[in-house]
Regions:
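Active-site anion-handling motifs in enzyme catalytic cores
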Residues: 1-208
Length: 208
């Protein structure tokens, strides 16, 4: 509490954290969505195909996501990592990394792509019809380019708080049981798109 009281400015990226900081410090605390949501982006109107399955901080969640990827015939594994070394051009090395990183050892693995840059990663998200992930920033980028997503719980409930502030509630959260039955398509409703666009607009205005 003393550390918070000593700060000249208190800011958080979700309303729940801002309220907790304000209660603990007795000072005003502002909040604005993650800055990635205020970035310019292209590709929202392009044709989409396939399913991207991402990763998570938690090994247990990565195992669930890897098993989910195996369910879909057109799924690709695209983690948040950007790896530029030429060694990862080797299918053998990618297959080994996939198995070790996710803690699963299937005979065959889904296509495994590691974009070299954040821009390339965003383009992959913008071109898919569904993104399944356990990463907070992957969800942010999905909203940025209006790609439908399903999200596993994150550490410290970051994703849940993000979606609450965005007006999406828990409809886009998925536990392992739901992912076992998930369809390869989960388009946004009109209300969801309206909420996401309003949230991005608010993020842009507060970031200025």
């Amino acid at each position: 509490n003393e550390m918070l009281q000593a700060c000249a400015l208190l800011s958080a990226r979700d309303s729940e954290s801002a309220a907790a900081m304000q209660a603990a410090s007795g000072q005003d605390a502002r909040w604005l969505p993650d800055l990635s949501l205020s970035a310019p982006a292209e590709g929202r109107e392009q044709a989409r195909k396939g399913v991207i399955v991402g990763d998570s901080v938690k090994l247990s969640a990565r195992k669930v996501l890897a098993m989910t990827a195996a369910r879909f015939t057109d799924a690709r594994f695209v983690p948040t990592k950007t790896l530029q070394s030429k060694i990862w051009n080797s299918a053998i090395m990618r297959g080994l990394l996939y198995r070790i990183y996710n803690g699963v050892f299937p005979l065959h693995t889904p296509p495994f792509l590691m974009p070299a840059t954040e821009e390339a990663y965003l383009k992959e998200i913008a071109a898919t019809r569904l993104h399944i992930t356990g990463r907070f920033h992957a969800v942010c980028l999905s909203m940025l380019v209006e790609t439908p997503f399903l999200a596993l719980s994150s550490n410290a409930s970051k994703i849940e708080r993000l979606l609450t502030d965005a007006g999406l509630g828990k409809s886009r959260m998925a536990d392992p049981a739901r992912l076992k039955q998930a369809s390869p398509e989960a388009p946004f409703s009109g209300d969801e798109l309206t909420a996401i666009r309003a949230f991005r607009q608010m993020a842009s205005e507060r970031a200025e």
